[in-house]
Curated annotation (Swiss-Prot):
SUPFAM superfamilies: TIMP-like (SSF50242). The keyword tRNA-binding does not apply. This is Metalloproteinase inhibitor 1. Glycans are attached at N53, N101. GO terms for molecular function: cytokine activity; growth factor activity; metal ion binding; metalloendopeptidase inhibitor activity. Zn(2+) binds at C24. One of its GO terms (cellular component) is extracellular space. Residues 24-27, 90-91 are annotated as: Involved in metalloproteinase-binding. The modification Phosphoserine is found at S178. Belongs to the protease inhibitor I35 (TIMP) family.
Length: 207
């Protein structure tokens, strides 16, 4: 597991507990980072309006899961995920689902707490059809192979310096001002040899 995963989880929890007067801010992760740092990664449809708990501290969305990419062991004996939980207010990183299309599938990466799937506005949630073919391949079968040894290392300002040979420098934000650049949409940080990771293309090979 990436050494940054516990830190990321801690930051996420801190954001969750932040007072409502402070806005929630976060840097979108590379999709491989989202996969590796999440307990559950699924494809699902949002099929119900949000339901609020009695104190309105959190809400839940009913979903219909169509595919699981990660989390078989974490889920245990539970046959399915029917709800996603999130803070009720966007100011404390609550996720707000804007699409009204209940047949649209989404890639959802979240944390499993007390047997429930939790997400925030900082979580990786994206329409499945908005992902590149390389990203879909990554979530389906490739990203998992890089989780143990490799780390996507964000570079947001110059100078950038890798801290380990197992890091891949992610420069999309720096070069394009977007987290949806070429490295995010087409590359994965994968082991090349023991103790070394490099960017590898996930673009479909032409026969």
């Amino acid at each position: 597991m990436s050494p940054f995963a516990p830190l990321a989880s801690g930051i996420l929890l801190l954001l969750w507990l932040t007072a409502p007067s402070r806005a929630c801010t976060c840097v979108p992760p590379h999709p491989q980072t989202a996969f590796c740092s999440s307990d559950l990664v699924i494809r699902a449809k949002f099929v119900g309006a949000p339901e609020f708990n009695q104190t309105a501290s959190y809400k839940r969305y009913e979903i219909k899961m169509t595919k699981m990419f990660k989390g078989f062991n974490a889920l245990g004996d539970a046959p399915d995920i029917r709800f996603i939980y999130t803070p009720a207010m966007e100011s404390v990183c609550g996720y707000f689902h804007r699409s009204q299309n209940r047949s649209q599938e989404f890639l959802i990466a979240g944390q499993l707490w007390n047997g429930h799937l939790h997400i925030t506005t900082c979580s990786f949630v994206a329409p499945w059809n908005s992902l590149s073919s390389a990203q879909r391949q990554g979530f389906t079968e490739i990203y998992a192979a890089g989780c143990e040894e490799c780390t996507v290392f964000p570079c947001t300002s110059i100078p950038c310096k890798l801290q380990s040979d197992t890091h891949c420098l992610w420069t999309d934000q720096l070069l394009t001002g977007s987290d949806k650049g070429f490295q995010s949409r087409h590359l994965a940080c994968m082991p090349r040899e023991p103790g070394m990771c490099t960017w590898q293309s996930l673009r479909p090979r032409v026969a």
